[in-house]
């Protein structure tokens, strides 16, 4: 294999070296379709395209460089290098990460011009691109124009339908796939789970394991999805289903990866079984992955063990693991539950100064919740005013909840008006405001909120409960 080809394969993860190699390619002329002879032995024809394809893929691996990949493609065309079936998949991924989808449409046009629309790689990438940029119509059109879509193309379309919540169409496509594989099942199960139909996700998983040709080792992504469904299903049998899946994992000797351990900890914690959480955490903590620590810290905080959660966070940082955005959401939530205002504010400040984590909207919302729970409503209001960006409804909602708890109608009035401007269609908001006004004896205002809710056409979410007697609900 030529020297440059070897270098390109080995320098994927070193952007500075790649730029240097790119400069060498340009100065020596080896990026051209017909490079100069006598310098290095090189295959003619496809070699220049190979170089560009490698450079495009390497830049794509660095998510902050989609524009570099697109510029390389423009340079490739300018120098008369003909793109091939391996060029377009990487380009379309870069286009999906770009600010505007227009570059992806231009790449689509280039694929048409090059006669690559019937190529499996290119077609799957086009469907995936349109799904990523939210254009399900174009994804469908691209798929429907295939004379004989293969399994990979159908899996791409199935994934696109699931991502955009069109589960009826996804199920219809899935049922028509006589050659569906684990990827097909995973897409559908994940689609139902992420769209809130947790029961159906579990039913589909049970249907999958009943097949005769079920793979000997389960798919990790599928297991994570179905465990997420068990975690979020509000049903008395959800825990037993989760235990069954855990047993399935053990019986099939599936490796307990960090992601799978995180899903198990989350599932057990949401059903109040901290003992199981601890067992799974102990089995995965040595892997040195932040997500399992985050899950265990969250499990402790969620189950009223906020002090233990903060101790575990200390142990995490002492062990050398660097916390991420999720870690600080969990830690700030634990501080809020314990009303540890000073400690929570200290951790919030240390996010950027000590750990290099830039606070996001979620973190600001956690601080507002921290101050609000402790009764510092004015401080919470002032804190919102100092935010570097406009507070969204989740931040104002945290303050409104605190106003309700502390029966502070003065702040609740102003915060409520702010929230109505942001989310005028949210029925729960009107109900909270009505309760705040009623608690303060402002019956006219309470009636006004009730009337506004009725006139808007929104409906109060219906409450429900069940009683379990034996095996009956």
Segments the model singles out, each with a brief description of its role:
Residues 1-150, 159-181, 187-473:
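Terminal (and in a subset, N-terminal) low-complexity or junction segments at the ends
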